[in-house]
Every structure is written in structure tokens, then in C-alpha cells.
Curated annotation (Swiss-Prot):
<feature type="domain" description="Fe2OG dioxygenase">
    <location>
        <begin position="258"/>
        <end position="355"/>
    </location>
</feature>
<keyword id="KW-0408">Iron</keyword>
<keyword id="KW-0479">Metal-binding</keyword>
<dbReference type="GO" id="GO:0051213">
    <property type="term" value="F:dioxygenase activity"/>
</dbReference>
<dbReference type="InterPro" id="IPR050231">
    <property type="entry name" value="Iron_ascorbate_oxido_reductase"/>
</dbReference>
<dbReference type="InterPro" id="IPR005123">
    <property type="entry name" value="Oxoglu/Fe-dep_dioxygenase_dom"/>
</dbReference>
<dbReference type="InterPro" id="IPR026992">
    <property type="entry name" value="DIOX_N"/>
</dbReference>
<dbReference type="Pfam" id="PF14226">
    <property type="entry name" value="DIOX_N"/>
</dbReference>
<feature type="binding site">
    <location>
        <position position="280"/>
    </location>
    <ligand>
        <name>Fe cation</name>
    </ligand>
</feature>
<comment type="function">
    <text>2-oxoglutarate-dependent dioxygenase involved in glucosinolates biosynthesis. Catalyzes the conversion of methylsulfinylalkyl glucosinolates to hydroxyalkyl glucosinolates.</text>
</comment>
<protein>
    <recommendedName>
        <fullName>2-oxoglutarate-dependent dioxygenase AOP3</fullName>
        <ecNumber>1.14.11.-</ecNumber>
    </recommendedName>
</protein>
<keyword id="KW-0223">Dioxygenase</keyword>
<feature type="binding site">
    <location>
        <position position="335"/>
    </location>
    <ligand>
        <name>Fe cation</name>
    </ligand>
</feature>
<dbReference type="InterPro" id="IPR027443">
    <property type="entry name" value="IPNS-like_sf"/>
</dbReference>
<keyword id="KW-0560">Oxidoreductase</keyword>
<dbReference type="InterPro" id="IPR044861">
    <property type="entry name" value="IPNS-like_FE2OG_OXY"/>
</dbReference>
<feature type="binding site">
    <location>
        <position position="346"/>
    </location>
    <ligand>
        <name>2-oxoglutarate</name>
    </ligand>
</feature>
Length: 410
């Protein structure tokens, strides 16, 4: 309240009043289209998920992440990175395919708790509610472009995957100073997903963490801003590994690293990022951040909007597959996670919708006209995802553009 920091559009999708065909529905439909065309995402106020269910899901997540590593690693998926994944000690996540369907979600229980566990029921119920919400939003989108005939085919061509995330709390006993580091301009620069910085050289913010121990200095006010020689390896943008099903994330493997010398003491240079900037590969994602903020979304103007968590609020975000399907009319925004609160563990849950394997994504002809010439060639989502794992896919400023952009000339 009263804050002038930029915010995402907030749209009320509350069940009580939103009935198809009602005047509220028509208004929400145009709000959804406008928000997505402008930002590729919006905040949604919802009442479909009770506080009780939210609490149960949080408890289930805490229980899951507290399992011994060997148990967590049983959450495997034939595709790499789609199961349990630990990212440089900064975050860890589980993946649950078809989390909204009870029988399928039970496969996840089998992996982690062969003796059975009631938590999965809560997670499944939660996924079911978010899936209903997601389908409503995708229905609103297609209606808003006047392609109602396509709704059933579209909804039937997709499935869901849930991702549960824990961002590990940073300790409190370090001194930090923000510094800017310029890395060479080149193909790798935009492995952080930032396609807009190519011409100016990519500037990345890195954080110098100095562990002030007795052996270094008793004085906590060490001035590390002076004489710190930062050597940030350009492998900051080493390579990105996408989630195997392509639904969501590009993780940087081998994050920002380098050394800074402070007197005789070595300090680690590390990204503050819990999750580097990326676009989701999915059609859509619904993200719920529990109490601790961290999610930031990039606007078309290149500004980062930090999304504040609220109990009955989720974020709807468009992915590359939706961008392609909608002939580029809806962008898939870059977003990242920066957990700035110390000593606080951040939990987040996201439900992604993906096109089924074998389904060809092709913009309906109604979305193509003189003002909007066809932007992408038809493709199978699996192929987009596989391309993402190639060197060329990783280096591309925009995976989607490089893979199937009409201007890519392939
Ligand atoms: O943790 C979050 O808030 C977002 C996670 C995310 O962007 C992803 O999993 O693709
Ligand atoms: Fe994401």
C-alpha cells in the first residue's frame, strides 16, 4: 500500500462471481488478454484454494525436503532434471508429472514413501485446484481472441507437471557488498536468458560474500568495496540446463563463480540468484510463493518487478509454447528468483501445463494477419525441448526464435 514500486496487473479470478458468460467474465477476459500481451503474466487473486489446504501443502513440502538425500533422489523421471534436482546448494526441487491426477500422483508417493503417506493427497488436491484455474485462464485467453472452436482441442492436448521448490536460507554471518561486473559481449552473455543486453555488453550483478571469521578481522565493518579484485569467470553463463520435460526452468549449472581477495582472505563471489533469469518452456505456469518473496519478472522495458507474496494470490505466467501457439501475441517473460531475506527458507510451488508429446503446436489462422504475420513454424514440443539441450539451443538468445522462428530462416 502506498508503495510506488512497479507491480504486475492484479486480476480477481475468484470462483464466487466469475461465471462463464457473465459480465464479470467478459471484463476479466479482456483484462487477462491485456495483462498477458503487456507482461506475459499477471497476479491472480483466488479463493479456490483454502488457507487450510495451503497450510497442508506447506507442511507436506517441509516433510518432503526434510527426507534424507537418498530418499529424495528416488524422485526420478526418465528425462533429466524432471525429478529431484539440487541446484548448487542454493535450491532443490521435486517434479511430479500429472500431479493433479490422484493415481498418477501416487507414483510419486511410491518413489519417496514406499510405505505410503497422506501428504500426496494434499499436493494432488492443490494441483487439481490450480489446474482448474489454469484451464479457466487458457479458456479466457482463447475466447478473447475469438477462437472458441479451438478450446477443447487445445485443453485436451496438454498435461500438467508440478514443481515443488525450496530455496535454502542464506546464513546471517556474512558481510555482503553488491558489485557490478561486466562480462564480454557474446553469445554466452544471454545464457541468463537476457536477450536484450546483447548490444551493450551484459552487465551482471554479483555479490561478494565475505565470511568474517576471527582469523580475518574482528571488525565487522570490513570495507570490501576497496581493493577487491573481482574476477568473474565468463562461465557465469556456462550453460543452462532445462527441466527435462521442458515445462519450465532453465537452471544455470555452474553458477557465477570467481574469487575476490580481501587482504589475505579469500572471499567467494556468488550470485544472489536462487534461480537465474529464464523463460519457461511450458504453455503456462501458476506459481505460488509462500510468504517469502523472491520472484522477479522482467518487463518489456527491461525493468524487474518483484512480486510480493500474498496468501490468496498466485502468478499466472506464459511460457514459450504459449507464445508460439499465440503467434507471438503473448510473450513469455523472463523471470528469476532472488532470495534476499537471510535465514529464511523460501518455499514455492508451481504447476505447469505442457503440450503432449506428438501434438503439433501451430498458431490458429485467426491469429495470423497482415499486422501479425506467422512468426513460428509448427513444431512438436518435445523437439523444442531437445533443441534446448543442444549447444546451439543453450547459446541462443531466444531458444524459441532459434528453433522455430520464421525469421530464423531454417
Ligand atoms: O520459485 C519461483 O517463484 C519461480 C520458479 C520458476 O520460475 C520455475 O520453476 O520455472
Ligand atoms: Fe520459471
Amino acid at each position: 500500500m502506498g508503495s510506488c514500486s512497479p507491480q504486475l496487473p492484479l486480476i480477481c479470478l475468484s470462483d464466487q462471481t466469475l461465471k462463464p458468460g457473465s459480465s464479470k467474465w467478459v471484463k476479466v477476459r479482456s483484462d487477462v488478454r491485456k495483462a498477458l500481451e503487456d507482461y506475459g503474466c499477471f497476479e491472480a487473486k483466488i479463493d479456490q484454494v483454502s488457507m487450510e489446504l495451503q497450510g497442508s501443502v506447506l507442511k507436506a513440502m517441509q516433510e518432503l525436503f526434510a527426507l534424507p538425500t537418498e530418499a529424495k533422489q528416488r524422485n526420478v523421471c526418465p528425462k533429466p532434471f524432471a525429478g529431484y534436482f539440487s541446484h548448487n546448494g542454493l535450491s532443490e526441487s521435486f517434479g511430479i508429472k500429472d500431479a493433479n491426477i490422484l493415481e498418477k500422483a501416487h507414483e510419486f508417493t511410491q518413489q519417496l514413501w514406499p510405505e505410503g503417506n497422506k501428504s500426496i493427497k494434499m499436493i494432488q488436491l492443490y494441483a487439481e485446484k490450480l489446474a482448474e484455474l489454469d484451464m479457466m485462464v487458457r479458456r479466457l485467453i482463447l475466447e478473447s481472441y475469438g477462437i472458441e472452436y479451438f478450446i477443447d482441442e487445445h485443453l485436451n492436448s496438454t498435461y500438467y507437471r508440478m514443481r515443488l521448490m525450496k530455496y535454502i536460507a542464506r546464513p546471517d554471518n556474512d558481510i555482503t557488498a553488491a558489485v557490478g561486473a561486466n562480462v564480454d559481449n557474446g553469445a554466452n552473455d544471454n545464457a541468463d536468458g537476457d536477450a536484450n543486453v546483447n548490444d551493450d555488453g551484459a552487465s551482471i550483478g554479483v555479490k561478494v560474500n565475505v565470511d568474517v571469521g576471527d582469523d580475518v578481522n574482528d571488525n565487522d565493518s570490513v570495507n570490501i568495496g576497496v581493493g577487491v579484485d573481482i574476477n568473474v569467470e565468463t562461465n557465469v553463463n556456462g550453460h543452462l540446463d532445462a527441466e527435462a520435460n521442458g515445462d519450465a526452468t532453465a537452471w544455470v549449472v555452474g553458477a557465477v563463480s570467481g574469487n575476490a581477495s580481501v587482504g589475505a582472505k579469500e572471499a567467494n563471489v556468488d550470485a544472489e540468484l536462487g534461480l537465474p533469469s529464464h523463460t519457461d518452456k511450458s504453455l503456462s505456469g501458476i506459481i505460488y510463493q509462500h510468504q517469502i518473496d523472491g520472484l522477479e519478472v522482467k518487463t518489456k522495458e527491461g525493468k524487474w518487478i518483484r512480486v510480493k507474496p500474498a496468501p490468496n494470490t498466485v502468478i499466472f505466467i506464459a511460457g514459450d509454447a504459449l507464445c508460439a501457439l499465440m503467434n507471438g501475441r503473448i510473450p513469455s517473460p523472463y523471470h528469476r528468483v532472488r532470495v534476499t531475506e537471510k535465514k529464511k527458507t523460501r518455499y514455492a510451488a508451481a504447476l505447469f501445463s505442457n503440450p503432449k508429446e506428438g501434438y503439433i503446436i501451430d498458431s490458429p489462422k485467426e491469429l495470423v494477419d497482415e499486422k501479425h504475420p506467422r512468426a513460428f513454424k509448427p513444431f512438436d514440443f518435445v523437439d523444442l525441448f531437445n533443441f534446448y539441450h543442444t549447444e546451439a539451443g543453450r547459446r541462443a538468445p531466444s531458444t524459441l526464435q532459434a528453433f522455430c522462428g520464421v525469421s530464423a530462416g531454417k
